[in-house]
From Swiss-Prot:
GO molecular function: DNA binding; DNA endonuclease activity; metal ion binding
Record-linked NCBIfam families: cas1, cas1_HMARI
E.C. designation(s): 3.1.-.-
Name of the protein this chain belongs to: CRISPR-associated endonuclease Cas1 2
GO biological process: defense response to virus; maintenance of CRISPR repeat elements
Transmembrane segments: none
Described function: CRISPR (clustered regularly interspaced short palindromic repeat), is an adaptive immune system that provides protection against mobile genetic elements (viruses, transposable elements and conjugative plasmids). CRISPR clusters contain spacers, sequences complementary to antecedent mobile elements, and target invading nucleic acids. CRISPR clusters are transcribed and processed into CRISPR RNA (crRNA). Acts as a dsDNA endonuclease. Involved in the integration of spacer DNA into the CRISPR cassette.
Protein's organism: Thermodesulfovibrio yellowstonii (strain ATCC 51303 / DSM 11347 / YP87)
InterPro entries hit by this protein: CRISPR-assoc_Cas1 (IPR002729), CRISPR-assoc_Cas1_C (IPR042206), CRISPR-assoc_Cas1_HMARI/TNEAP (IPR019858), CRISPR-assoc_Cas1_N (IPR042211)
Keyword tags: Antiviral defense, DNA-binding, Endonuclease, Hydrolase, Magnesium, Manganese, Metal-binding, Nuclease
């Protein structure tokens, strides 16, 4: 299985013949191209056109993040799998209000079901979350009445507000208090973890879209515009609770991530390099971990689940099979 490469240090990414290496002031590390799926760059890294040409030939994506861990863009090799037919079907389902709303509703419903699964998981392990679960279930009953994607987004936002109230109960750690959701910049340690982990889920979904016939620029819950990819944001809603949030709960509850892994920057709090390494390792392990897939009858990784989700969306767009969002079984 191909791997993701994370570069946190400053240095230069270079091509040498048919391989890559990353060079810092202290060392040179060779990168096996045949085993690399994508490169995520968090440090100050220089490269040249010759390298980018080689990455295109090797079909390796580069995702760039700023110092604070926010996604800023990708080097996306030419769309070798893009299908004109699929782009037309994506556009058709976006331009038709009913078809777009149908898909958007499924993304929200999938996200909410997985949020509930996470809460039930911790409730069954001694965390008192019954009131929050009941409130989320109550709000979710309004989804079928939505007539616009804005209304759907409002409901999801309301549910996430209640969901975030569970974080302090689940974590029970005086060094990691949620308070309220803040971003750009995050105001505390938990928000710094959430923002960083969410960025990783967005880019993972983008990398997997690249391996399908879908175009990431056409989403349904998040409005398509000139500025950004949106389909990966839609799909990420389903997986953030079971990948990003579970990763955060794990490293905080196990005391793996600590206050010294954060630093103040301007008017916010960000992960330092060691903190980023800790969360990156946990996220990578979670994406590579497997579950038993009921329909396929075999174990698949969480990264593979994202790819399978995209294949289901393709079938829906081609009107071969109605899309049903993935809901975890634990």
């Amino acid at each position: 299985m191909k791997k993701s490469l994370y570069i946190i240090s400053d240095g230069e990414l270079k091509r040498k013949d048919n391989t890559l290496y990353f060079e810092t002031s202290e060392e040179r590390k060779y990168i096996p191209v045949e085993n690399t799926r994508e490169i995520l760059i968090f440090g100050e890294v220089s490269m040249n056109k010759r390298l980018l040409e080689f990455l295109t030939e090797s079909e390796i994506i580069i995702h760039f993040f700023n110092y604070y861990g926010y996604y800023i863009g990708s080097f996306y090799p030419r769309e070798h799998l893009n299908s004109g037919y699929m782009i037309l079907k994506q556009a058709e389902h976006y331009l038709d209000t009913g078809k777009r709303l149908n898909l958007a509703e499924k993304f929200v419903s999938g996200a909410i079901e997985n949020i509930k699964k996470v809460l039930i998981y911790y409730h069954n392990r001694g965390k008192e979350l019954s009131e929050i679960i009941s409130k989320i279930q109550e709000i979710a009953t309004n989804i079928p009445d939505c007539s616009t994607t804005d209304e759907l987004m409002a409901i999801e936002g309301n549910i996430r507000d209640y969901y975030y109230q569970s974080f302090d109960i689940i974590l029970d750690n005086e060094h990691f208090i949620f308070e309220t959701r803040t971003k750009r910049p995050p105001k505390n340690r938990i928000n710094a973890l959430i923002s960083f982990a969410n960025s990783l889920v967005y880019t993972t979904c983008l990398s997997e879209i690249y391996q399908t016939h879908l175009d990431p620029r056409i989403g349904y819950l998040h409005a398509t515009n000139f500025r950004r990819f949106t389909l990966n944001l839609d799909v990420a809603e389903i997986f953030k609770p079971i990948i990003a949030d579970r990763a955060i709960f794990s490293i905080v509850n196990k005391r793996i991530v600590k206050p010294q892994h954060f630093e103040k920057k301007l008017d916010g709090i960000v992960l330092n390099d060691k903190g980023k390494q800790i969360l990156l390792q946990e996220m990578d392990e979670r994406l590579r971990s497997t579950i038993q897939h009921k329909k396929l009858g075999r174990h698949v990784s969480y990264r593979q689940l994202i790819r399978l989700e995209l294949y289901k969306i393709q079938k829906h767009l081609m009107e071969e099979e109605e899309y049903k969002p993935f809901v975890t079984g634990w």
